[in-house]
């Protein structure tokens, strides 16, 4: 316990010594100041009574305080004195900040962007799939069916200028937005360039608004531009919609589906949208088990355009430097883009799917989409009766037809026709946008290049040959055919087949059935009769090559030795 008290006492002593040292320095400083004052006023103080030295009083008081502190249990606290930033330094910093904000980098921005060196097609080139190895043909036997799956390597090149908008990118695809022309842009995942901007004028093409259709957005951020567009639309509904109808602007595209990259290039839409909303079974398509067509209907209610700049720097605040743009990704490999317009409306995606192996599937689907009466065409009607249809609406009153799955294509037609008029209850949705290169206002089109495998499947059904001999003569037959299969590399393997009774003499009446597998091809049927003539002992009655495989092939011979008759009919 005594050790604790001793430690506590010495701690106070150390603290008091530190305090005394500080006080001593202050006393010394005061004494020097008093000496200077005494020298200047010596003549005026000779008659005054002498005063005790301030240092002695201070020392005496300090000693008393020291004793009091030593005998006290209170802790000694010393607070360091903060040294404030000199006002001159503050003013200098303010001055520098103001100077930077007032510097005009317009000329620098123009010079640097104009000097960017790039090829528009190369920076926006999108290379899809590259097909190296695939099995060109495959044969699948199922009961009395033989399915031939044929694959052909194809390629597609497109350069669309209107790019589909998905929800995840609306905040970087609005009118007057700045983007980078890089890989992200080609994949519909554009990188935004966010910086201080000049005011921007935008225009909406709703009818009847006149000059009111153009407004200026002081700070063209996504939020501010969206608010300005909403205000324009509401203004149109309130004041101009009564006597005006919107012009019908519908874009329609269709394509058979073979792969993700192929359908993206063909329809200019992100395959994730189609896969996520329509549920495309790409695996079954590649196997030839299903055939799928996608149709996209784009109905544009209105378009919002941003005024194109005369010079690149027109879109930036004068304080923006090219170094700042470089830090945000601008380069020869990723030049800046400017969103020139955005189309608002709704999109209807329709999926037509069938397991039919008919070669007329694409024609049947196209006829249905175009409104052709397919009931008069038996082949088309059969295909559509064995198909399913799915429609998904993006934009408009999507809640009414969010997703429709049906076997009746008339239901799909109604989905396309319904809610085709723009109103408050049927609002528009950003569906596509167009960007231009900031350097020269050239339209930025994604150069899609992709290879894909076009898969077609043809189904063959087994058949039979019905032989019937009713002629007044001795007859002989030769029935030949090939059976087709494919090895694991897709190479055709041909097996020669023949009827066991070839060249056997048959007298009338005679009939038999020769079964043919579903993979039978190159069928040859020959029948001859014995004339009894020495110079023409045998005469051919039938000699047909490449007889098509059918459910029933009826081969009939009749007549006399000098007037034989033969025919082949199909059932």
UniProtKB/Swiss-Prot annotation:
SUPFAM superfamilies for the chain: Perfringolysin
Gene Ontology molecular function: cholesterol binding; toxin activity
Sequence motif Cholesterol binding, residues: 561-562
InterPro entries listed in its UniProt record: Thiol_cytolys_C, Thiol_cytolys_C_sf, Thiol_cytolysin, Thiol_cytolysin_ab_sf, Thiol_cytolysin_sf
Biased composition (Low complexity): 37-48
Top-rank taxon, per record: Bacteria
Membrane topology: Multi-pass membrane protein
UniProt motif (Conserved undecapeptide) ranges: 529-539
Localization per Swiss-Prot or TrEMBL: Secreted; Host cell membrane
Membrane-spanning residues: 260-273, 280-289, 358-367, 375-387
Signal peptide coordinates: 1-33
GO process annotations (BP): killing of cells of another organism
Keyword terms, alphabetized: Cytolysis, Hemolysis, Host cell membrane, Host membrane, Lipid-binding, Membrane, Secreted, Signal, Toxin, Transmembrane, Transmembrane beta strand, Virulence
Stretches with biased composition (Basic and acidic residues): 50-68, 79-108
CC per GO annotation: extracellular region; host cell plasma membrane; membrane
Positions of region (Disordered): 30-108
Primary localization class, coarse: secreted
Function, as annotated: A cholesterol-dependent toxin that causes cytolysis by forming pores in cholesterol containing host membranes. After binding to target membranes, the protein undergoes a major conformation change, leading to its insertion in the host membrane and formation of an oligomeric pore complex. Cholesterol is required for binding to host membranes, membrane insertion and pore formation; cholesterol binding is mediated by a Thr-Leu pair in the C-terminus. Can be reversibly inactivated by oxidation.
Binding partners and assembly: Homooligomeric pore complex of 35 to 50 subunits; when inserted in the host membrane.
Family the UniProt entry places it in: Belongs to the cholesterol-dependent cytolysin family.
Protein name (Swiss-Prot/TrEMBL): Streptolysin O
Organism: Streptococcus pyogenes serotype M18 (strain MGAS8232)
Species lineage: Bacteria, Bacillati, Bacillota, Bacilli, Lactobacillales
Gene label: slo
């Amino acid at each position: 316990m005594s050790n604790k008290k001793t430690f506590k006492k010495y701690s106070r002593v150390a603290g008091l010594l530190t305090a005394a040292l500080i006080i001593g320095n202050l006393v010394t400083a005061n004494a020097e100041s008093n000496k200077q004052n005494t020298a200047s006023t010596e003549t005026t103080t000779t008659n005054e009574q002498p005063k005790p030295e301030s240092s002695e009083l201070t020392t005496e008081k300090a000693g008393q305080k020291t004793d009091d502190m030593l005998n006290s249990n209170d802790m000694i606290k010393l607070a360091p004195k903060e040294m404030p930033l000199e006002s001159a330094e503050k003013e200098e910093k303010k001055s520098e900040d103001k100077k930077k904000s007032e510097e005009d980098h317009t000329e620098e921005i123009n010079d640097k962007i104009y000097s960017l060196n790039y090829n528009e097609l190369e920076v926006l080139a999108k290379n899809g799939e590259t097909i190296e190895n695939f099995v060109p043909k495959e044969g699948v036997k199922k009961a009395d069916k033989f399915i031939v799956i044929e694959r052909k390597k194809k390629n597609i090149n497109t350069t669309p200028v209107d790019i589909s908008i998905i929800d995840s990118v609306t905040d970087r695809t609005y009118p007057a937005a700045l983007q980078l022309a890089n890989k992200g842009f080609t994949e519909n995942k554009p990188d935004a360039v966010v910086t201080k901007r000049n005011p921007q004028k935008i225009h909406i093409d709703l009818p009847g608004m006149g000059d009111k259709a153009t407004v200026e957005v002081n700070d063209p951020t996504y939020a501010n531009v969206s608010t300005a567009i909403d205000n324009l639309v509401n203004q149109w509904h309130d004041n101009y919609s009564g006597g005006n109808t919107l012009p019908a602007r519908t874009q329609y595209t269709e394509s058979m589906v073979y792969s993700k990259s192929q359908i993206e290039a063909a329809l200019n839409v992100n395959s994730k949208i189609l896969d996520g909303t329509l549920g495309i079974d790409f695996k079954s398509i590649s196997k030839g088990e299903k055939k799928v067509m996608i149709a996209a209907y784009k109905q544009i209610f209105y378009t919002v355009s941003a005024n194109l700049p005369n010079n690149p720097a027109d879109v930036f605040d004068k304080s923006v430097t090219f170094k700042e743009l470089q830090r945000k990704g601008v380069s020869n490999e990723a030049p800046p883009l400017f969103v020139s317009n955005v189309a608002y409306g709704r999109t209807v995606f329709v999926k037509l799917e069938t397991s039919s192996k008919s070669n007329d599937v694409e024609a049947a689907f196209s006829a249905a989409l175009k409104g052709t009466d397919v009931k008069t065409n038996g082949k088309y009607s059969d295909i559509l009766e064995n198909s399913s249809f799915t429609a998904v609406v993006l934009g408009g009153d999507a809640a009414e037809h969010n997703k429709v799955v049906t076997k009746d294509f008339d239901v799909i037609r109604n989905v396309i026709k319904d809610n085709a008029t723009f109103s408050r209850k049927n609002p528009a949705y950003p569906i596509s946008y167009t960007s231009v290169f900031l350097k020269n206002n050239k339209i930025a089109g994604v150069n899609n290049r992709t290879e894909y495998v076009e898969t077609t499947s043809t189904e063959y059904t087994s058949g039979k040959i019905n032989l019937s001999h009713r002629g007044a003569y001795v007859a002989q037959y030769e029935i030949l055919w090939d059976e087709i299969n494919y090895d694991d590399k897709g190479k055709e393997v041909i097996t020669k087949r023949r009827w066991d009774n070839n060249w056997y003499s048959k007298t009338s009446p005679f009939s038999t059935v020769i079964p043919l597998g579903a993979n039978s091809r190159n069928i040859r049927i020959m029948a001859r009769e014995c004339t009894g003539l020495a110079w023409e002992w045998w005469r051919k009655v039938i000699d047909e090559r490449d007889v098509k495989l059918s459910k029933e092939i009826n081969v009939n011979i009749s007549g006399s030795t000098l007037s034989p008759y033969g025919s082949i009919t199909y059932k």
